[in-house]
Amino acid sequence: MTKDLHETESPARRNFIKAGMVAGVGALLTPLIVKTAQAATEAAPAAAAAAAAAGEKPKLKIGDVLRVAREKLYPICRVCPECDGVACAGEVPGMGGIGSGQAFKNNYNALNKIDLVMRTFHDVKKPDLAITLFGQKLSMPVTSAVTGGVSYNMGKKMTEEEYVISILGGCQDAGTIGWVADGIGDQMDVFERRIAVLKNTFGGRAIVTIKPKTNEEIIKRFRMVEEAGGIAVAIDIDSAGRAARAVPGQTVEPKTPKQLAELAKSTNLPFIIKGIMTVEEAKIAVDIGAKGIAVSNHGGRVLDYTPATATVLPAIADAVKGKTVILVDGAVRRGQDVLKYLAMGADACLCGRPLVRGAHGGGRDGVALMMNIIKDELTVAMTLTGVPNARNVPANVIAKVQA
C-alpha cells in the first residue's frame, strides 16, 4: 500500500531517520572540524613567534584561553559555552554543584532571568567603575571569588603557587584584588605555601578566607595573614557542613554568635563572614562586628536546593546596607551580572569559575583577560542604563522595579 505523503509517520521511524541524518552530517563535518582546529593550533606558534620577533607580546585571545582551559580541565570542567551547572551537576569534588546541582543552577537561572532597563537620554559617556574596598582602590566592583583545591577540584594541572600567582596577579593587572582560599582537605603546609606567595610576591594585597575550623585554628591562621600584610580575613561559614572531607584534627563546624564575636575581636584586620543567606544572620554579623559579609551559597556546592543569592540579596541589602560591606557571589559571568547585583544592593561582586578557566587557560594573563572583559562589559552596561558610577547603582536599573 502506498503511504499518503501527508500521513503522520510513527515517532520511532522519525527518530530513526533523524538519528541517521545527524550521524551522516557528523561524519561529514568531523574531519573538517578537526582539520580546522589543527590548522588553528599549528598557526598559533607561528603567529606568536612573529609577534616576539617584532618585539611585541602576543595578544591573548579569549578563544585560545578557553581552548587551553578545556584541554587541561576536562573532564572536571567542560568549559561549557554557558557555565550554568547543568553538565557538571553533582560533581563535588570538581567544579559542579552538590547533589542534583540545583543550587548552582538556581544561582545561574535567577540572575539570568533579571532584565536591565536601557536608558540613553543622559550624559553618561564614561561611567566611573572605581570603588574603595577595605582601604583598597579598585578599578571596578569585582574581585576574584574564593576558589581553591587545585589537586582535588581542578585535576592538579597547576601547582598551588602557580594558581595563586595567576589569580592574584591577574586581578592585580586588571586593577582589582583576589582572594586566597583555605581548602577543606588541605594540610597546614598547603595553606602556608599560599600565604608565602601572598607575602613574597604580592606584599599581602589580597583577602584570605579560612574554613570554619575551631576558633583556635582560625586565629592561628589570622596571625599568619596579619604577618603577611593581608587586606582582610574571612571565614566561609558555608563550609560548616563538610566535616567529613576535612583533614583529621582540622574539623569544620557551625559558629555561635559568641564564637563569631571572638573571631572579630581577635584580629586587627577587617573580618568578613562569607555564606550569609538570611536577613537574620546578616543582622547578627553586623552586631558581632563583621566589617563585611558575602552573600553566598558557596557556588551551590554545599547544600542542595538552596535559593539563589540573587533571590535573597535584596532583602539582606535592605536590612544592613551601609552598616557593613555587602559582597555577593553566584554565577557572575558577565559585566551585566555585576550591574544586576549592584542594583540589588551589593557593594561588590566575587567572580569564581570564569577565573578558574582563565588561570588554567592563560595563567596570570588569562585571569587579567577575563577580568578586563567583565570590566568592559560593565562599562557598556552602565552607559546604556545611564548609571554614572558603580558606587550608587539605582534599583530601577532592573526591569521589574523600573520607575
Task: Please report, for each region that a protein language model flagged, where it lies by residue.
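N-terminal secretory signal peptides
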Residues: 1-12, 38
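C-terminal segment of N-terminal export signals and the immediately downstream linker at the start
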Residues: 9, 31-71
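Alpha/beta enzyme core
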Residues: 215-307, 312-326, 344
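N-terminal export leaders
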Residues: 13-29
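N-terminal functional module of multi-domain proteins
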Residues: 103-187, 194
